[in-house]
Amino acid sequence: MHIQCTKALLTYWNPKIEEKNTDHDMYAWHAHIVKRSRKNLLVVMHDLSRFTLVFYGVKKNQLKELFPMITIAQMNSLTASGFTLDEIKPYFDMQPNHITFSQSKNRTLVARLNKAVEYADFLLSQDGYYEDSIEQIHASVFCNQLLVCENNYKVCYEPKDKFKSYLDLLNDH
């Protein structure tokens, strides 16, 4: 799994950078962190589908265990979005067992990531957050049901539907 971090996340956490080509990588994600109400809001977005994971109250020492945290959040968010375990099993079976990091170079994806952060921030400010968990499944499900448009609004889709189409491609092979 490869995560391209925004400058804010790189400054906050300072992970080891490893350049990698992720143009059509099913395991490529973008991540951004912002402070909200004295706590960190971490949003991780899948590059190909814009599928979003939301974490609130993340501490710096928890970022050292980011791989299991993201894997569990992926599983929970996918099942909460209506995926069956049979549909998502191949994705996790083929998933790399570690995370590499680099700085984001795609301004379009960073802009979409910022929009996902806005949506998550809005929902958490309106509906609140789960205090017993840093993973905010309700915010992830909300972000994954909103339409994302590309190509000057000629192509619009829900991130969960796009992620499902990639899972179907993965399941066919």
Regions found by a protein language model. Give the residues of each.
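Globin-like tetrapyrrole-binding proteins
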Residues: M1-E19, I88-H173
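Short, low-complexity, polar/charged sequence segments that are solvent-exposed and flexible
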Residues: F51, Q62-K64, I72-N76, A120
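N-proximal short alpha-helices
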Residues: D23, K39-V43, D86-K89
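Short, basic/aromatic recognition patches
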Residues: Y12-R36
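Short, solvent-exposed cationic patches
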Residues: L66-K89
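A short, conserved beta-strand element enriched in hydrophobic/aromatic residues
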Residues: A28-E65
